[in-house]
From Swiss-Prot:
InterPro entries: Osmotin/thaumatin-like_sf, Thaumatin, Thaumatin_CS. Pfam families: Thaumatin (PF00314). SMART domains: THN. It comes from the Eukaryota. Residues 1-26 form the signal peptide. Disulfide bonds join 35-224, 76-86, 91-97, 139-213, 144-197, 152-162, 166-175, 176-184. The keyword Disulfide bond applies. It comes from Juniperus ashei. This is Pathogenesis-related 5 protein Jun a 3.0101. One of its GO terms (biological process) is defense response. Belongs to the thaumatin family. Residues 146-157, 158-170, 178-191 are annotated as: IgE-binding.
Length: 225
C-alpha cells in the first residue's frame, strides 16, 4: 500500500512540475543528433554539449527569453576544463558557448513575441543538415536536409562547411546593406542554398522562410534529419 502511495505521489509531483513549467512560460528544446558522427551542440542561451549519434540534449528557455539560436559544431576537441576548438561553429574555444559560433554554421533561430517565430538559417553559411520540429502539429517543420557542402562553389568552401557570399565577399549586394537594404534580390550564390533547401533562410532578405507557431509550443531540433 505504501508503494502505491509513493507512486501516486511521484506522478502527482511530476504533473505539478510539468504544469508549473507550462504556466511559467518555459519553452523546451530537445536537441537531437541523428548524424553518423559526433556533433557538439551549442545554444544561446543554453551553452553546449557533446552529442554522439542518437543522443539528445534538452534546453529549457526561461519565461521572458526573447530569442535563442542553436547550432551544431563539428571536428571539436576539448580538454577536461571545456577548452578547445572546433572545425566549424566554434564559439571562442569553449565547450559551453556564451558567444555566437564562427561561420559557416547552419542555425536554428527562435524569437518569442505575440507568438513564436522560428527559422532554419543559412545566412551564416552551412555546415550540417538541420530541422526544427514544433510539437504543435499545425505548425510547419522547416528543414535543410541536403548536404550543401557537396555542391558548394569553390570560392565559398571551407573545411567542413560552405560559407555565405556575404561572409566571403562582404559587399553591400551580398549582405543586403546600404543601397540594397530595401531592395535585395536573391543572387546566384543564395539561389544555390535555396535550391538545395527551399524551406531555409538563404540570405538576409529571404523573409518567406520565417515560420510562426502559437506561444507555448515546444520544439525539437534535429541534426541530420
Amino acid at each position: 500500500m505504501a508503494r502505491v502511495s509513493e507512486l501516486a505521489f511521484l506522478l502527482a509531483a511530476t504533473l505539478a512540475i510539468s504544469l508549473h513549467m507550462q504556466e511559467a512560460g518555459v519553452v523546451k528544446f530537445d536537441i537531437k543528433n541523428q548524424c553518423g558522427y559526433t556533433v557538439w551542440a551549442a545554444g544561446l542561451p543554453g551553452g553546449g554539449k557533446r552529442l554522439d549519434q542518437g543522443q539528445t540534449w534538452t534546453v529549457n528557455l526561461a519565461a521572458g527569453t526573447a530569442s535563442a539560436r542553436f547550432w551544431g559544431r563539428t571536428g571539436c576537441t576539448f580538454d577536461a576544463s571545456g577548452k578547445g576548438s572546433c572545425q566549424t561553429g566554434d564559439c571562442g574555444g569553449q565547450l559551453s558557448c556564451t558567444v555566437s559560433g564562427a561561420v559557416p554554421a547552419t542555425l536554428a533561430e527562435y524569437t518569442q513575441s505575440d507568438q513564436d517565430y522560428y527559422d532554419v538559417s543559412l545566412v551564416d553559411g552551412f555546415n550540417i543538415p538541420l530541422a526544427i520540429n514544433p510539437t504543435n502539429a499545425q505548425c510547419t517543420a522547416p528543414a535543410c536536409k541536403a548536404d550543401i557542402n557537396a555542391v558548394c562553389p569553390s570560392e565559398l568552401k571551407v573545411d567542413g562547411g560552405c560559407n555565405s557570399a556575404c561572409n566571403v565577399f562582404k559587399t553591400d549586394q551580398y549582405c543586403c546593406r546600404n543601397a540594397y537594404v530595401d531592395n535585395c534580390p536573391a543572387t546566384n550564390y543564395s539561389k544555390i542554398f535555396k535550391n538545395q533547401c527551399p524551406q531555409a533562410y538563404s540570405y538576409a532578405k529571404d523573409d518567406t522562410a520565417t515560420f510562426a507557431c502559437a506561444s507555448g509550443t515546444d520544439y525539437s531540433i534535429v541534426f541530420c534529419p
